[in-house]
């Protein structure tokens, strides 16, 4: 019997602001327990003051998620004791959140889901403060607490249980994170704790189980897969899930933490030290919409259409980094002005440039390789002044030795003797080409035989690669390819 996955998300997103939610402490990363105020560590007599920048940033998130902003919202205390919660309560919005309702739409074209469209409803969005961070590593009987994170501004976005597949969950999280980055709501740096997700999983109409505090998409996806299988096996054995519980994820399996708390357990009460937030909703929505830029979906559509014609995967890579996107636009502008096809700038930007950086664990910066230099290098390739292979050699050399990246690219190609050799009317060079090919054919007779018999036609690319390597990439692959085919035919 096919079982149905029913999944809802509670996404805790750290807001991109300079100061904390209810104090003047900086939100910058720093040494433990240095960015703290009296209120952050719960000293008696300290009181909260709402940071207006946090409120505005949260409202931008509400508008971008099509959520209905409430004209009056309030702050409440959620009581529980834990070492990283010095006040003994967390300030959140239980009774009257900043907004209610909303949705995020997924599509087959942009999000690669199976359905043509999928509407994921938002139940509500609330503003709340983060806790401190407990540290247990390498300490057997003690724990440390870093209060730098205490009182950091968060929004909690609670979805309806509308997600029915792992593919939908991945698509939703990717789109949500991209939207928050584009709208400048969050840094989107998952490794720095910018987003933590609680997942509610149930099977068919069974009771839901909550999996707490996951910080990566892979962890979320794997936890959902495991929990779905666990619940399905239990149901198939005649043991339906009847009790709400909270579970953790250890990287391999979910494990029981406790029974799911109810609102009574947290003893919610209005915070007497914080006044209600009263908003002119029409005015604030109008102002925020004027501030917002093109949505990620609109940007994807633009990049995937003429004149850019970028594939979805590459367009997503560009959107993940504003600086990279700006670099690409500048590169495209320079290359298109020289009538160079659109495949060149995206290939060099996303594959050659980012590939080198990933291999060497370097963060992207437009200063690593000036855009005008890369445009000139692409122009030299297009005009057959350098082969693609030798262009890569020069590119990687200049990235590793930036002090040498001065002067015209064509001069650097000449300096390092990387220029493409024209063999068309040079009998001596043509003889050299034939000699290289003969050596390669003699070295790999088995491949030659396969090609002559019509088997594995793609094997010619291997022979071609050997020829290019011998010539140090200075002779066009097309020259070798045509001569190779001729010689293999002659051998026949």
Curated annotation (Swiss-Prot):
GO MF, any single term: glutaminyl-tRNA synthase (glutamine-hydrolyzing) activity
PROSITE patterns: GATB (PS01234)
Compartments it resides in: Mitochondrion
Catalytic activity line of the entry: L-glutamyl-tRNA(Gln) + L-glutamine + ATP + H2O = L-glutaminyl-tRNA(Gln) + L-glutamate + ADP + phosphate + H(+)
Enzyme Commission code: 6.3.5.-
Enzyme's top EC category: ligase
GO BP terms in the entry: glutaminyl-tRNAGln biosynthesis via transamidation; mitochondrial translation
Disulphide connectivity of cysteines: none
GO cellular component: glutamyl-tRNA(Gln) amidotransferase complex; mitochondrion
Key words of the record: ATP-binding, Ligase, Mitochondrion, Nucleotide-binding, Protein biosynthesis
Gene3D superfamilies in UniProt: 1.10.10.410
The protein's role, per its UniProt record: Allows the formation of correctly charged Gln-tRNA(Gln) through the transamidation of misacylated Glu-tRNA(Gln) in the mitochondria. The reaction takes place in the presence of glutamine and ATP through an activated gamma-phospho-Glu-tRNA(Gln).
Family: Belongs to the GatB/GatE family. GatB subfamily.
HAMAP family (UniProt xref): GatB
Complex formation: Subunit of the heterotrimeric GatFAB amidotransferase (AdT) complex, composed of A, B and F subunits.
NCBIfam families: gatB, PRK05477.1-2
Miscellaneous information on this protein: This protein may be expected to contain an N-terminal transit peptide but none has been predicted.
Protein name per Swiss-Prot or TrEMBL: Glutamyl-tRNA(Gln) amidotransferase subunit B, mitochondrial
